Amino acid sequence: MSELVYHIPVLLDESVNGLNIKSSGVYVDVTFGGGGHSKEILSRLNGKGHLFSFDQDADAEKNIEASEGFTFVRSNFRYLKNWMRYYGIEKIDGLLADLGVSSHHFDDESRGFSFRFDAPLDMRMNKRAGKTAADVVNEYDETKLADIFYLYGEMKNSRKIASMLVKARQKKTIQTTLDFITAVRGQQIPTNTMAESREKKDMAKLFQALRIEVNHEMEALKEMLQSATELLKPGGRLSVITYHSLEDRMVKNVMKTGNAEGKRVQDFYGKVETPYRLVNSKVIVASADEQKKNPRSRSAKLRIAEKI
């Protein structure tokens, strides 16, 4: 498996160590990407156990190398439970998820994930299905757009941005990343380095919001985490790397309470019930050395929990 053209795996040793791998166990990497984490897991199975790796992006298949005890599943990880049933797997020993968007996606101009390039406003992980980001910005009403930017981009001025988009699309269909940037920027051009930096951060949040909506990322994450909780054996490990507060909050909630909303369920005696024991009470972040070598690791947070 070669991650050279895709991305450098983040928190590689920390996340795989967190699985506490048994050489004969069954493991799942729900975010194959460049194959870096999968390759490390396979090296610790020594041909005795089995690894299932998921990725819905056809480009990820280019990184597959035939390996004993390895199965690649081209699918969204929200269908984890269905695929495990298909392969006759009732329980698993561990699951790893690196929820970051691969560098490959940001660097591929044709995918429309980055505001660095003028490209079709697509943003679909699976290019075969679903609405594009252009469909979202041209078809959703103003209220729905504002909600997306507020919930998924955490933009305080989401209503103003939505209003600007609606006015812009009345004059011209928004088809490219540059069309989108021009529409939400309006007439205001950064006048200094600080303003330019602030605008880049805002653009990153807006693009994040669109990407999450287009790919139904939060719904998919919720379903995957629910399936993982059902599939993990007692003593099985869940190792998840997050990159923004929305997904980190959901992962934290599931690990602490067993549900995505963070609702505490109590037994008859008032004791809070949870299916997990936290392995690390505080999030694990990349070392200064890793952050220097791989800047995308700066926002990464690793949480590990063990099924009770």
Regions found by a protein language model. Give the residues of each.
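S-adenosyl-L-methionine-dependent methyltransferase catalytic core, i.e., the SAM/SAH-binding region
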Residues: 1-308
